[in-house]
UniProtKB/Swiss-Prot annotation:
It is a peripheral membrane protein. Pathway: Cell wall biogenesis; peptidoglycan biosynthesis. This is UDP-N-acetylglucosamine--N-acetylmuramyl-(pentapeptide) pyrophosphoryl-undecaprenol N-acetylglucosamine transferase 2. GO terms for cellular component: plasma membrane. The lineage of its organism: Bacteria, Bacillati, Bacillota, Bacilli, Bacillales. Its main location: membrane. It comes from Bacillus cereus (strain ATCC 10987 / NRS 248). It is found in: Cell membrane. Keywords: Cell cycle, Cell division, Cell membrane, Cell shape, Cell wall biogenesis/degradation, Glycosyltransferase, Membrane, Peptidoglycan synthesis, Transferase. The keyword Transferase applies.
Amino acid sequence: MKKIVFTGGGSAGHVTPNLAIIPHLQEQNWDISYIGSHQGIEKTIIEKEGIPYYSIASGKLRRYFDLKNIKDPFLVMKGVMDAYVRIRKLKPDVIFSKGGFVSVPVVIGGWLNRVPVLLHESDMTPGLANKIALRFASKIFVTFEEAAKHLPKEKVIYTGSPVREEVLKGNREKGLAFLGFSRKKPVITIMGGSLGAKKINETVREALPELLKKYQIVHLCGKGNLDESLQNKEGYRQFEYVHGELPDILAITDFVISRAGSNAIFEFLTLQKPMVLIPLSKFASRGDQILNAESFERQGYASVLYEEDVTVKSLIKHVEELNQNNEMYKTALKKYNGKEAIQTIIQHISEA
């Protein structure tokens, strides 16, 4: 039986692509383990899946000054030692890393054990963790073809983004029943990321009187961001977040308004949902979401509304443009074949 160790964490985006791949390897009887941090989101997600999970020390890698920068390099070194010992015991045939700060010690620990390491980079430019890790990797899979110019050409394999199978299996009838929506108006699903987005939430709520004339709204507003005064508003449903219901919600969704995190927007792409993308600004991120969104706009998948331009008027304008040009967007979206991503990655894992 072949063995594989997965790693990646710090945010859900560094875990969900692994969840898209793991079931396919389970079908092929791979022995699967996961190495992550002691308290990261990856621990909660992976343990729910019943996959053996091993914790290591980890320190955050920062591009800015912080007093924790003094302590964290020592935590990374401790993490490398922890990972080295764990990998030596597990004896995997290959390691698959999705990035995030916890992945660096695992990648180095794997390299020291002479285990082939495969990376996956979701964004147009590599994050700091993958920038460090790629020198220890034999291959790096990229979601965007444009990402290749930022990486060693001999290691790069373009795959697109692996999408979880359950996202593609939503039931329209269940979605309508869950939300209490009618079939008569189009549905817009609005997502601000796992923590929500204050400006998006406020603007959407200000725009509701106009939007609800033509659309039904599902608003995933993030933890602590519900507006109690809108709980019973007809045609509007708000949630902090959803889990098992998301595929059914997406099944009835006509348009999406979202941040531009790579994993989420590739799920919308695979489901052929036209998008208004509101990327995180350069002041709040390293600018990767802006590049992601602009790439989707160039390919005709989405319309980009920059954070600094978000107003009630601009939001409604972008939604109307999406609605009026729906067929044009659908034609572009149909050209993408999301199923090839997992097949390509599985093939290279098997050959490692």
